Amino acid sequence: MDIKEIKVGIADLNVGKNPDKIITVGLGSCIGIALYDGIKCIGGLSHIMLPDSTQFSKVTNPMKFADLAIPILVEKMEKLGARKNGLKAKICGGASMFNFSDKSMVMDIGNRNGKAVKEKLKELSIPLLAEDIGGNKGRTMIFDTSTGKVYIKTVGLGTKEI
């Protein structure tokens, strides 16, 4: 059985099944959302940039936004055979990559992204099993669909499993 490495770009998402590995790099203030059906060994990974699409008059890429991308990811996973009621989530990213003198929520995209992702997961009744969010360093997320394990490589801090 060949292991595929499936890349997920910024404002992108993709799905895979055992033994695929799904990878996204460049998670700063963005959030990576890994969804997993452990019975079917089907996984999906989304790399969102912004919390909410409703602030924009025209949305050209729904995968950029937490409120739109997560339901699209669930739908793609269901088409691959996943069960929505069997999905579990792990998330990472949401860093504050820049120091702003204005500490308002408007500037704190990483924190806003984290809150929006958690709200959408709760709305969809998808339990959040683990998270690695915040801080001020970039991350890479590697999702192993054979086990559901998510490995986080953080700049200057090495690799850990969540």
UniProtKB/Swiss-Prot annotation:
One of its GO terms (biological process) is chemotaxis. This is Probable chemoreceptor glutamine deamidase CheD. Belongs to the CheD family. It comes from the Bacteria. CDD domains: CheD. It comes from Clostridium botulinum (strain Hall / ATCC 3502 / NCTC 13319 / Type A). Transmembrane segments: none annotated. InterPro entries: CheD-like_sf (IPR038592), Chemorcpt_Glu_NH3ase_CheD (IPR005659), Cytotoxic_necrot_fac-like_cat (IPR011324). Its EC number is 3.5.1.44.
